[in-house]
């Protein structure tokens, strides 16, 4: 089943957010279940339509279709399960039944109403093997899957209130309905999306510029993922501000570059996650999505360009994949060049994220040819203001940094 380009996946943008006047009456008397982290972020993204056509967490039929056929029960392409897990003991203690509505809360504030349509179990090893191509627990996505509780609750979610987004993320929070209007106002008839979880070096910059040329796009939408962090990752503040300064410093014109955030916890599902990213950016209003080497990969679980090949095996999802190889520095050409264009193969120098990170860790400004000085300055400023002195996630950051989103009280 294929729907039209420029329309949301499934043809209709989901938006399930209560009017503030309705909220007190709708949540009165509901059983409450506290949630955190991944579940909070997915609830917000579901309610605002980032994951259209999903209106909530999947039931068994959808999970089964996604796991085995890479599609929803309705027939639309979908590649990654979205589930809400709960231990049977908790289900029994709260006397939760199919047909009930429960209130999920975050930090003791109302988050979403979950209308329970189904309570079911699923083979987590089967799920992991099909989605990630492995059942090895050293794969982070497999560990996440095995960490789910023994039961799942499927059903629609409705956001109780608009979330509060803290600085510096507030201006980058643009739900699909808002972002689509902004892209239309910019006149972006052809928008190419860039998925990232990194501070940009010039290899990333040229990946974006190359995709812009290749797709004949009107603009580039940089859409960093904000989700679970591990020690050693770049802090989210450095990532999103570093991406934004590329435009502010003139490396992209004001009218061809924009940044917005996506609440999503990476699954590292390689080619399957590439399909998921394409669908989400389609919902944001993009017509194209760039995919470079090792997209959404981890370790050596996937081939370098598996995320390219998968689009030849699935039905058209309504967004054009822009498949790019590698940009690197050539000392003979004295500049950044593209795989297959430059003839100095023996001289090419690949961008090393680990080397760049070690230079930044020492507080040394890398050569501008591989890392823009304005990006470095913004990253170091973010380290001081948000990272307790480090541009990388530390144990202190994990313990003390405030969540990117919180929920307000519901006024009666």
Model-derived features with residue positions:
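Active-site cores that bind ATP or allylic diphosphates and position pyrophosphate for catalysis
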Residues: 1-412
């Amino acid at each position: 089943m294929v729907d039209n380009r420029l329309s949301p996946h499934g043809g209709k943008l989901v938006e399930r957010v209560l009017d503030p006047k309705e909220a007190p009456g709708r949540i009165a008397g509901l059983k409450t279940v506290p949630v955190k982290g991944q579940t909070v972020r997915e609830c917000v993204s579901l309610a605002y339509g980032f994951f259209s056509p999903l209106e909530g967490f999947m039931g068994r039929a959808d999970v089964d279709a996604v796991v085995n056929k890479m599609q929803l029960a309705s027939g639309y392409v979908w590649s990654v399960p979205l589930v809400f897990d709960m231990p049977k003991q908790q289900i029994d203690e709260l006397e939760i039944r199919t047909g009930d509505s429960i209130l999920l809360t975050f930090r003791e504030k109302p988050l979403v109403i979950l209308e329970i349509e189904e309570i079911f179990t699923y083979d987590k090893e089967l799920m992991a093997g099909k989605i990630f191509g492995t059942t090895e627990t050293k794969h982070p996505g497999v560990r996440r899957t095995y960490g789910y509780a023994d039961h799942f609750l499927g059903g629609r979610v409705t956001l109780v209130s608009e979330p509060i987004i803290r600085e510096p993320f507030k201006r980058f929070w643009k739900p699909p309905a808002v972002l689509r209007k902004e892209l239309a106002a910019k006149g972006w008839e052809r928008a190419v999306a860039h998925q990232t979880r990194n501070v940009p070096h010039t290899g990333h910059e040229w990946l974006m510029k190359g995709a812009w040329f290749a797709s004949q796009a009107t603009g580039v939408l940089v859409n960093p993922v904000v989700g679970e962090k591990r020690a050693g990752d770049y802090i989210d503040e450095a990532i999103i501000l570093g991406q934004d300064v590329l435009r502010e410093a003139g490396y992209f014109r004001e009218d061809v570059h924009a940044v917005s955030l996506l609440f999503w916890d990476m699954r590292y599902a390689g080619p399957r996650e590439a399909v998921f990213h394409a669908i989400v950016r389609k919902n944001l209003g993009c017509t194209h999505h760039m995919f470079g080497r090792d997209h959404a990969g981890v370790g050596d679980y996937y081939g370098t360009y598996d995320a390219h090949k998968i689009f030849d095996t699935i039905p058209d999802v309504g967004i054009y994949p822009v498949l790019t190889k590698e940009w690197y520095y050539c000392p003979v050409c004295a500049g950044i060049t593209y795989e297959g264009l430059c003839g100095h193969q023996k001289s090419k120098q690949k961008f090393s994220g680990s080397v760049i990170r070690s230079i930044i860790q020492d507080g040394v400004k890398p050569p501008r040819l591989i890392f823009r000085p304005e990006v470095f300055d913004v990253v170091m400023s973010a380290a001081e203001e948000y990272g307790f002195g480090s541009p990388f996630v530390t144990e202190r950051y994990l313990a003390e940094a405030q969540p990117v989103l919180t929920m307000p009280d519901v006024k009666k």
